[in-house]
UniProtKB/Swiss-Prot annotation:
In Fusarium, the biosynthesis pathway of the sterol precursors leading to the prevalent sterol ergosterol differs from yeast. The ringsystem of lanosterol in S.cerevisiae is firstly demethylised in three enzymatic steps leading to the intermediate zymosterol and secondly a methyl group is added to zymosterol by the sterol 24-C-methyltransferase to form fecosterol. In Fusarium, lanosterol is firstly transmethylated by the sterol 24-C-methyltransferase leading to the intermediate eburicol and secondly demethylated in three steps to form fecosterol. This is 3-keto-steroid reductase ERG27. Keywords: Endoplasmic reticulum, Lipid biosynthesis, Lipid droplet, Lipid metabolism, Membrane, NADP, Oxidoreductase, Steroid biosynthesis. 3-keto-steroid reductase; part of the third module of ergosterol biosynthesis pathway that includes the late steps of the pathway. The third module or late pathway involves the ergosterol synthesis itself through consecutive reactions that mainly occur in the endoplasmic reticulum (ER) membrane.
Amino acid sequence: MGSQLIPATAPWDSVPAQEQLFVLITGANSGIGLSIGERLIDEFLATRSLRSHLILIPTTRSKSKSLQTIKALRDYARKAAQTSQALQSRVGSSYRWQDTVARVHVLSLQVDLCDLRGVYAFADALVHGPVSNPEGLEGEYLKNVRIPRLDTVVFNAAYGGWSGVNYPKAIWVILTEGLVQSVTWPSYKMALPTARLNDKANYDYPKEPPLGEVFTACVFGHYVLAHELLPLLCRQSETETPGRLIWSSSLEAIERVLDMSDFQGFKCDGPYESAKRVTDILSLTATLPASLPSSNRFFTPDDPAEARAKPIRPRMYLTHPGIVASTLFPVPWFFMWAYELALLISRWIGSPWHNTDSYTGAKSPVWIALQEQSALDELDAERIKWGSSSNRHMQVEVKKTEVEGWGWEGKVEDAAALNADTAVGVFKKTVGRKRGAVDVTKEDIVKFEELGAESWKNMEDMRHEWENILGVKKA
């Protein structure tokens, strides 16, 4: 597999590797995904050296969406370069916004995460290259360029699978549980039964084993993609910054939504929330002893020579955007104003999670992507679910998020430990808890680790099973 084309010289080849940052974002043509790209541009330009290059690789499901995304991110970079007082002050009177724009590159490729054959082909093209932007661009056209590595991959793409809102129930829940709780953990969304991708002719899957649409779009497609991208994510030595896999989860990934006997959520009332619970469990337990027999296989490249040459595995992190006014939520456009108002009011009265707009919601994955590795290691950041959070004054921070059965950091914390939290105001751990939340116990954490081991085994079994079904690996 792989292309035989000779790679062209890329614009970022003019600087050393430490002055390059390669970030792939799935589902990046709108919403949170597009905002992650925008926020990366802002924070990268504000914090990195004036020689450094940012290479954004937003994925979409069509060439037309890729062209729109490239244009949107280029326009955003141009505006940022022209209006940034911080950049002008860093450079001085010799500042030219054109020089700044020339350090931001957008290469958009297409992948449908429900099309597993397409996922394998996408990863193969990116790993072996070269790759190109779709035809039809003005300005910089990246053609036949090679991606030497990936520094960060953000798993943002998702599919909700909702049919609408039960409005009488919504009114009742708001009246009985209060506005903040009811718009943070809404129990009135109506989910469609998750579709079997096997029944969709365009994917050409066999009738069995079943493959759930929501589960594959949210979890399994990303899981397969991550493994296939290991040649770009693994490193040769500890002196190199490891690659980062960043999952985008949800506040709604609560314990009761996942039934391990219905792992793909075919029978549950909330397949999206169930898939996000699986995401939480996988990410938080990836390095725990019980999960290692399966997770070590996942983090090892298939090519033995590649595995020997690059033994340093990528790190896995967990984030969520808080609550934003997204088209993913099943509200008709003519009711969206009311939904946005409810989110605003919730933030005004003290909720840390109602960020309202997608740019604010993009804070946590961008923060993970741009932090020094030593800072993340000191925080033991792989054991924490990092949420995008804001207060009524629109101060935006990352906030540790409670996970049912795990707590905030995978350890028991008594009142004294929680009182020692140095965060201020709504950014403190205990602000914004779900009503009825109980403090985690040692027994809970043991059970969570067991769920992790079972989930990792399930995912690895699925990955190998579908590799064999599709025949995508060389003998």
